[in-house]
C-alpha cells in the first residue's frame, strides 16, 4: 500500500522499480500464523506505463500465488484506487462492525463519499486515471457521478468483503 514508486524511481532508477498492487485479505495472527481471508486483485506494472519482458516474467512468477494476476500499463491508477479504498477502510476501523456491514450501512454513505471524493480528486489532479477492482469503482467518486453509481459501488464492496474470512480491516486489528 502506498505511492512510493515515483520516489523510488528517482532514487534508484526506474529500471529497478516495478509497481505492485494487491487486494487479497490477510492478517498476521502470530509467529508462523497468517490468516488468508480471501482472494483479491493482484496487479503489477511498470512505473513508466510500459510492459517489458521482466513485467511478464514477474506475472508468471506471481501466478503460482494468484493465477489471475494482471499486468497493467496504469499501475498508478490501481494504487490510487487502493488509496481511496484504504482511506475508507480507515473509517470502517472506527466502528466495531465488519467492513461488509460498514459499506452496507446507509447512515455511513456520506462519510465514505466524502473520503473517496477527496482521494479521487487528488489522483485526478496528479494526472492519474484511477482503476476499478473487486467492487471498487472510482467513477462513483467523480464530481459528475450519480448517487446510484456510488450506491452500486458500496453494495459491491460490501458483497466482496462479506465473502472474506477477514471481517475487519488490518487498521481495525491494529487499533
Where are these regions (language model features)?
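Internal alpha-helical scaffold of NAD(P)-dependent oxidoreductase catalytic cores
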Residues: 11-16, 29, 35-136
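A broad, low-specificity signal for short, low-complexity segments enriched in glycine/proline
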Residues: 3-9, 46-48, 147
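Hydrophobic alpha-helical segments typical of transmembrane helices
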Residues: 4, 54, 170-171
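Short, functional N-terminal and low-complexity linear motifs
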Residues: 23-28, 82-89, 137-140, 152-158
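NAD(P)-dependent Rossmann-like dehydrogenase/reductase catalytic/cofactor-binding core
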Residues: 113-175
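Rossmann-like NAD(P)(H) cofactor-binding subdomain of soluble oxidoreductases
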Residues: 1-33
Amino acid at each position: 500500500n502506498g505511492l512510493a514508486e515515483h520516489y523510488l524511481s528517482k532514487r534508484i532508477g526506474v529500471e529497478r522499480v516495478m509497481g505492485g498492487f494487491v487486494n487479497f485479505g490477510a492478517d498476521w495472527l502470530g509467529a508462523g500464523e497468517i490468516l488468508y481471508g480471501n482472494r483479491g486483485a493482484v496487479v503489477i506494472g511498470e512505473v513508466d506505463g510500459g510492459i517489458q519482458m521482466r513485467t511478464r516474467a514477474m506475472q508468471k512468477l506471481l501466478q503460482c500465488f494468484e493465477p489471475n494476476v494482471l499486468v497493467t500499463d496504469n499501475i498508478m491508477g490501481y494504487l490510487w484506487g487502493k488509496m481511496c479504498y484504504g482511506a475508507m477502510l480507515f473509517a470502517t476501523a472506527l466502528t466495531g462492525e465488519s467492513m461488509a456491514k460498514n459499506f452496507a450501512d446507509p447512515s455511513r454513505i456520506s462519510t465514505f463519499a466524502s473520503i473517496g471524493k477527496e482521494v479521487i480528486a487528488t489522483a485526478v489532479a496528479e494526472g492519474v486515471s484511477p482503476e476499478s477492482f473487486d467492487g471498487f469503482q472510482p467513477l462513483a467518486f467523480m464530481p459528475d457521478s450519480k448517487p446510484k453509481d456510488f450506491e452500486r459501488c458500496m453494495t459491491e464492496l460490501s458483497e466482496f468483503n462479506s465473502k472474506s474470512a477477514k471481517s475487519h480491516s488490518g487498521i481495525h486489528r491494529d487499533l
